[in-house]
Regions:
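A metal-dependent hydrolase metal-coordination microenvironment
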Residues: 1-112, 116, 122-126, 130-133, ...
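Fold-independent oxyanion-binding glycine-rich loops
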Residues: 65-67, 87, 116-119, 174, ...
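C-terminal functional module detector
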Residues: 1-6, 10, 165, 169, ...
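Short loop/turn and capping residues at structural boundaries
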Residues: 46, 117, 172, 216-217
Length: 290
């Protein structure tokens, strides 16, 4: 557990990882050790179609989870990977289930449904609009940049979905498979919570967007009327994104930047922010609806 720049306690959390129980290269015990050593407080082990209950491994807290993937490898026919996190019991699902059935069953079991790596899956805003109850989506997925498609970043999906009125909490996850230093301990969320909080409280904090997604930097976004402010750890770039294809004050570059401000334009529907540090590591804010 760490405290942010405002003294708020936060947990370092990864919500997407695989083990030898499906297609990962480490056992659950080895995977937990890797993340424990990297300072993580909570992880969800999300093997494909293999539900793992909540608990603890080697002192690392485990949220229940599984990844339900459907559609094979051809995005033209629809590919959906949905994480079921924090379920109180095993969802009653078969691999014939469609994406909406998966979401509904995860909710029936008191979990949250996260749309995984939409850029990697080539998911569209139209596909997302057909799904009811998606609780969050990944804006970054580490393994998707490692030899499969090089589509780790889902910002374009997030923005086009927001243009259609679809707003999601944005998480960053590893989706660890190889554990080779490229896809492990590279992206996470910093969740406003305490390690003594219940699973239900952690899930509620995620749904209420009480976190930021990051590869290292800290980021906070605030709105005061038509003024949007980002406060962050020292970075070299602060960028604002919205439905406006062009607007002033959206790109800020420099050394040791810790703050940037932009003003909302009358036609804007949403604004979010990203920061990039000197090492190229990014952090992503929540989406502010206007």
């Amino acid at each position: 557990m760490e405290k942010d720049m405002f003294g708020v306690s936060r947990l370092k959390v990864n919500l997407h990882m695989h083990t030898t129980l499906s297609d990962g290269s480490k056992t659950p015990e080895e995977a937990a050790e890797t993340y424990k050593k990297a300072g993580y407080d909570v992880v969800a082990i999300t093997d494909h179609w293999i539900y793992r209950d909540s608990g603890e491994i080697g002192g690392l807290r485990i949220l229940s989870g599984a990844e339900y993937n459907i559609g094979g490898g051809d995005a033209s026919t629809g590919v959906y990977h949905i994480l079921g996190i924090g379920c109180s019991k095993k969802p009653n699902l078969t691999q014939e289930a469609g994406p909406q059935k998966i979401i509904d069953e995860v909710h029936r079991c008191s979990g949250i449904a996260i749309l995984a790596h939409p850029a990697w899956s080539l998911n569209t805003a139209q596909q997302a609009a057909a799904l009811n109850g998606v609780d969050a989506t990944e804006i970054f997925n580490s393994v998707s940049d490692e030899g499969e498609s090089s589509r780790p970043y889902s910002g374009d999906f997030v923005d086009t979905a927001a243009c259609q009125g679809l707003f999601y909490p944005l998480v960053a996850d590893d989706d660890t498979h190889m554990y080779n230093g490229c896809d492990d301990t590279k992206a996470w969320i910093m969740l406003e919570a305490k390690i003594t909080d219940s699973d239900e409280a952690l899930l509620q904090a995620i749904k209420e967007e009480k976190f930021y997604a990051t590869q290292g930097p800290e980021i906070h976004i605030r709105r005061n009327g038509d003024e949007i402010t980002v406060l962050c750890s020292p970075v070299s770039r602060i960028s604002f994104f919205s439905n406006a294809v062009w607007a002033p004050e959206r790109g800020h570059r420099g050394t040791g930047l810790i703050k940037a401000v932009c003003h909302v334009q009358p036609w804007e529907k949403f604004i979010r922010a990203e920061v990039t540090d000197e090492q190229g590591r990014k952090a992503w804010s929540k989406v502010i609806r206007l």
